[in-house]
Amino acid sequence: MSLFNKIVKEFQWGQHKVRLETGEIARQASGAVLVDVEDTVVLATVVGAKSAKPGQDFFPLTVDYIEKTYSAGKIPGGFFRREGRPSEHETLTSRLIDRPLRPLFPEGFYNEVQVVIHVLSVNPEVPADIPALIGASAALAVSGLPFNGPVGAARVAYVNNEYVLNPTREQIKASRLDLVVAGTERAVLMVESEADQLPEDVMLGAVVFGHEQMQTAIDAIHELVREGGKPEWDWQPAPKDEALNARVTELAQPELLAAYQIRDKQARSTKLKEVYAATSAKLEEEALAAGTVAADKATVGNILFDLEAKIVRGQILSGEPRIDGRDTRTVRPIEIRTGVLPRTHGSALFTRGETQALVVATLGTKGDEQIIDALEGEYRDRFMLHYNMPPFATGETGRVGSPKRREIGHGRLAKRALVACLPSADEFGYSIRVVSEITESNGSSSMASVCGGCLALMDAGVPMKAHVAGIAMGLILEGNKFAVLTDILGDEDHLGDMDFKVAGTAEGVTALQMDIKIQGITKEIMQVALAQAKEGRMHILGKMKEAVAGANTQLSEFAPRMITIKINPEKIRDVIGKGGSVIRALTEETGTTIDISDDGVVTIASTNSEGMAEAKKRIENITAEIEVGQVYEGTVLKLLDFGAIVNLLPGKDGLLHISEIVNERVKDINDYLKEGQQVKVKVIQTDEKGRVRLSAKALLNEAAGQTDTPPQQ
């Protein structure tokens, strides 16, 4: 009898064969599923605590996606030779998996849940993120935890005007779209995408196509659960205290209504804190008078939050003005200033209402490119975008330090939005780093980073293909009634049902991200949201074009200049020298940065034009070929009885025979030449062994109008 009750489900999914297994590995976890997609293998596990911690008032879900280097047949680098802190890719994939899972846990479920996905084997052509998301969904489904799944996911490419399901890496490179969509049988929950200025209908079509295709995976998970699922947990939400709800509503509703008539964020926030504090204090006072225990502040806070949501959502659905007085389609006032920082290469201050981004662009050389050691192999990235949001941006105190998951995710979204409109490396050879410092935040700071990033790049002289703007949309959905909100505030994000971010140019979409807090939305709602987002984006693009018509034609005086020369690839080793000695001396002595590609393209960069010219001259000398008939100013290295060894170029010497020094007979060479002396010579012969014969006499004869003496054999 086997130790294992192993259940296996296999299905064909697009061009890939998928295998789901449970019951053999990680049996002590609440749920564990092994997913194999054409040799990319992931193990997804989930463990749920049997009870919530006392006083817990939020859902503590953690998702960790971990890539093991052995999966690609590698040993980790570093002193310890083991995996360390998560890479940016691992962090982004963890967020990608978390986002569609989180809204499917029932309200009031506060037990700690941890989802861990290990990448165990990698086929370089099959990205592991979709198998990981499918595995996490399946592990939750078989665990018996209260979870309204399963979730399916799919990657969609757009090649030759056709959608491609779960493309290979090579197909992704040729595609104008890289879109990941996740959802349930009924609706879409999450979208993450990067596109090359595609129209809205193509983007929507990709989402719908992905949702249709993921049903195959959802069906397979259902079958796996039927045969290998654990019993469902007997969990019920804590009963609501209707009396407490009624009393909190009675005490706080008038004050909350008044607070949401205040248009200024800081003043409104102060008023809301006062309402929360006063309500809790009044309830404690009443409990003390009655000799009972007061409701804990977390419970009261949750009731007040629900009451806030009801007020704000009700006002919007009934056609009343939004929190800050706008209607559903209006973008907040925009102010733009470029060239803000005098010594940076490019900078912009982009302000939209109470959201503000100070964005800086820096130009570098090929040596500044980011080297990324991925499972699929090492590669370089010439464009970096980093997003920072310090606590002062929201008027709060807090930790300052390394970027959190949210900051990494927002930075990647802004990067996705801009990368399609960057010039190619052939057009603009610089590496580029954009840093967005969020100095104020009240909603949609990632989209402010897109707008500010585009403006900072143009200020730096980067020839962008087009202006790029981004906008965040919200949704209020109650039954069959819904309202799509343009340019959402932070409070509308917290109290609403959707965060839908769209970035692009006047031609089309470059990035789209959608997160749904309810159990999915329909195609019709997405259609309305995309159309309204385009309207808002065009408005912002108009403001940006008014402020900055196009990229600066001159780079900042503080940015490095570049020149490019082509050398014989066989001469690369001469420029580098033994152990890098030659190129190291070149860069140090000329104050330049020198990059050499395998095809012999040499890029010299410096803020000093004289240093660049000197480096160029020296490289040309190192790689130059000695030609018969050329005249050189050489240095006498060594005197011999029969002539002198003369250095013509770095590493290239020739023989000046005693008979080629002057026309008369030379008895003692020391009468004519000394070591270290500069002498002008002409190349009169070279042979297949690289030996070079020189003549000074030939130049004397030419000056006197005589013909050259024939070279000696």
Curated annotation (Swiss-Prot):
SMART domains: KH, S1. GO terms for cellular component: cytosol. Keywords: Cytoplasm, Magnesium, Metal-binding, Nucleotidyltransferase, RNA-binding, Transferase. Residues 560-619 form the KH domain. Its cofactor is Mg(2+). CDD domains: KH-I_PNPase, RNase_PH_PNPase_1, RNase_PH_PNPase_2, S1_PNPase. Gene3D superfamilies: GHMP Kinase, N-terminal domain (3.30.230.70), K Homology domain, type 1 (3.30.1370.10), Nucleic acid-binding proteins (2.40.50.140). GO terms for biological process: mRNA catabolic process; RNA processing. InterPro entries: ExoRNase_PH_dom1 (IPR001247), ExoRNase_PH_dom2 (IPR015847), ExoRNase_PH_dom2_sf (IPR036345), KH_dom (IPR004087), KH_dom_type_1 (IPR004088), KH_dom_type_1_sf (IPR036612), NA-bd_OB-fold (IPR012340), PNPase (IPR012162). GO terms for molecular function: 3'-5'-RNA exonuclease activity; magnesium ion binding; polyribonucleotide nucleotidyltransferase activity; RNA binding. Its EC number is 2.7.7.8. It is an enzyme of class 2 (transferase). It catalyses: RNA(n+1) + phosphate = RNA(n) + a ribonucleoside 5'-diphosphate. It is found in: Cytoplasm. Mg(2+) binds at D493, D499. Involved in mRNA degradation. Catalyzes the phosphorolysis of single-stranded polyribonucleotides processively in the 3'- to 5'-direction. Belongs to the polyribonucleotide nucleotidyltransferase family. NCBIfam families: polynuc_phos, PRK11824.1. This is Polyribonucleotide nucleotidyltransferase. It comes from Burkholderia thailandensis (strain ATCC 700388 / DSM 13276 / CCUG 48851 / CIP 106301 / E264).
